[in-house]
Curated annotation (Swiss-Prot):
Gene3D superfamilies xrefs: Homeodomain-like
Gene Ontology molecular-function annotations: DNA binding; DNA-binding transcription factor activity
A Pfam family this chain is assigned to: Myb_DNA-binding
Domain HTH myb-type: residue ranges: 9-62, 63-117
Coiled coil, from the record: none
DNA-binding region residue numbers: 38-62, 90-113
Tissues with expression: Ubiquitous.
Domain of life: Eukaryota
Location relative to the cell: Nucleus
CDD domains the record matches: SANT
Organism of provenance: Arabidopsis thaliana (Mouse-ear cress)
UniProt name for this protein: Transcription factor RAX3
Effect listed in the UniProt record for changing L229I: In strain: cv. Cvi-1
Gene Ontology CC terms, in alphabetical order: nucleus
Length: 310
């Protein structure tokens, strides 16, 4: 068993209300009131309407304090904020809006405000995404600028504090190279000196004695004995304490035609002076006094200068 019907549905009119029906219902309620019984009210007025339909028509449309027309922007914001907070509880939302019924609010929400809110949220979401993308782009640009600045500073530091290790075109001063080459090991200096002496001696002999070139084979022994005498490590050149000069070599080997001329003696003296000036850094002189410089002095200069250099 269910609840008894409020009216005879066969004799009840359905559909929209006419202006005459609205006027009858409004005038009766304003004069007599509802009486607390909406079921018996249609029979008293003479309307072929259901009691529920009369109640809803009065509450939603015919009351004197109801607002008709569109919703203001402030009302829309209140409806949206309350809907996001409590959902579709229209009676509670209508209590916050004087003059608005829950039915009007629900209809307005479903027809217009819902779409408007969705579009607004979509636009805000797009704007937030755009702002986030712009922030990401700005952060990337700042990061790239920082990387460029750091790399530039590192390059400046490398160019300021890094010594060029692989520069093959660096020009070393000639004076330093000459001094370095002059203070080499004596075992490497002696053969070069002897070779130069012999070569210059041959050139001088060809100029002074053109027929001497034919006797080169006979003079080779003299050159060899002179070279071996200088290069022999077992021979004590400086052990006797006496000056081992070029004059002693000239007097010892009298058979050689190279040592019998005054020009040769003068050439050996000049060569000694040039050799001493080469190791000491002084200018070359060809005076007759420098011809008395001994090989002992040359050896002492070579050893002392090489020790100081190394």
């Amino acid at each position: 068993m269910g609840r008894a019907p409020c009216c005879d549905k066969a004799n009840v009119k359905k559909g929209p209300w006419s202006p005459e029906e609205d006027a009858k219902l409004k005038s009766y309620i304003e004069n007599s009131g509802t009486g607390g019984n909406w079921i018996a009210l249609p029979q008293k007025i003479g309307l072929k309407r259901c009691g529920k339909s009369c109640r809803l028509r009065w509450l939603n449309y015919l009351r004197p304090n109801i607002k008709h027309g569109g919703f203001s922007e402030e009302e829309e914001n209140i409806i949206c904020s309350l809907y996001l907070t409590i959902g579709s509880r229209w009676s509670i939302i209508a209590a916050q809006l004087p003059g608005r019924t829950d039915n009007d609010i629900k209809n307005y929400w479903n027809t217009r405000l819902k779409k408007k809110l969705i579009n607004k949220q979509r636009k805000e979401l797009q704007e937030a995404c755009m702002e986030q993308q712009e922030m990401m782009v700005m952060m990337k640009r700042q990061h790239q600028q920082q990387q460029i600045q750091t790399s530039f500073m590192m390059r400046q530091d490398q160019t300021m504090f890094t010594w060029p290790l692989h520069h093959h075109n660096v020009q070393v001063p000639a004076l330093f190279m000459n001094q370095t080459n002059s203070f080499c090991d004596q075992e490497d200096v002696k053969p070069v000196l002897i070779k130069n002496m012999v070569k210059i001696e041959d050139q001088e002999l060809e100029k002074t004695n053109p027929h001497h070139h034919q006797d080169s084979m006979t003079n080779a022994f003299d050159h060899l004995s002179f070279s071996q005498l200088l290069l022999d490590p077992n021979h004590n050149h400086l052990g006797s304490g006496e000056g081992f000069s070029m004059n002693s070599i000239l007097s010892a080997n009298t058979n050689s035609p190279l040592l019998n001329t005054s020009n040769d003696n003068q050439w050996f003296g000049n060569f000694q002076a040039e050799t001493v000036n080469l190791f000491s850094g002084a200018s070359t002189s060809t005076s007759a006094d420098q011809s008395t410089i001994s090989w002992e002095d040359i050896s002492s200069l070579v050893y002392s200068d090489s020790k100081q250099f190394f």
